[in-house]
């Protein structure tokens, strides 16, 4: 398990490193790389590749899609750490991106990683049909925006210091964490041109995995 996870993390980072290096250079690249290569385990990519392997999808295609997912995840962490959000100064044992590079640079680096995710999905590097690319981009957009990560973060902030029902907390955690996991499970089904009901089945599995992941993470934080 760990060996496979290490391989996926290595291959995903290699893809991202090459993709970023092909970009026109800008002053934001160092902050983008700092947030992107911060030592995460690439759990989301692992789940995507496991589901994709069950559906006999080419590993390189899955790595590319997983790289897009990791861009979204990195963007969300950079923004979550900002003073106006969770105000976390440390991320994975290192200064958060806004501490290292400044708040405005962190916002712009996060925005750039968000858009780079869709650039990866639209690029010729990903060898799938244009129709499937559009479907993947649509689904990832939904999981990243007000119906997903951004909406979940909004709810998280609005529930601070308030007594909140269990159902509302679950809704928040599904949006904030579960939606990106749901994309990881649904993407292979989209590539294989499964019907709407089948895709929803995979989405629900991913959402449940994401919810369990977030609950476990919260318990670890609670216990210190």
Stretch-by-stretch model annotation:
Residues 10, 17-224:
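Mg2+-dependent prenyl diphosphate-binding active-site environment of isoprenoid biosynthetic enzymes
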């Amino acid at each position: 398990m760990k060996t496979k996870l290490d391989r996926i993390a290595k291959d995903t980072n290699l893809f991202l490193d090459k993709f970023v290096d092909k970009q026109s250079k800008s002053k934001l690249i160092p902050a983008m790389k700092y947030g992107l290569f911060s030592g995460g385990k690439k759990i989301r990519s692992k789940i995507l590749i496991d589901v994709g392997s069950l559906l006999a999808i080419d590993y390189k295609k899955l790595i590319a899609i997983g790289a897009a997912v990791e861009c979204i995840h990195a963007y969300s962490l950079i923004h979550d750490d900002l003073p106006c959000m969770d105000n976390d100064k440390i991320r994975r044992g290192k200064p958060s991106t806004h501490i290292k590079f400044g708040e405005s640079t962190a916002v712009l680096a996060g925005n750039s990683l968000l858009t780079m995710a869709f650039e990866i999905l639209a690029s010729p590097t990903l060898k799938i049909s244009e129709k499937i690319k559009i479907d993947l981009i649509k689904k990832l957009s939904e999981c990243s925006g007000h119906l997903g990560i951004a909406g979940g973060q909004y709810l998280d902030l609005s529930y601070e210091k308030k007594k909140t029902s269990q159902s509302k907390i679950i809704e928040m955690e599904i949006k904030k964490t579960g939606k990106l996991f749901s994309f990881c499970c649904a993407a292979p089904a989209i590539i294989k041109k499964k019907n709407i009901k089948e895709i929803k089945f995979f989405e629900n599995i991913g959402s449940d995995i994401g919810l369990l992941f977030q609950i476990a993470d919260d318990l670890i934080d609670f216990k210190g």
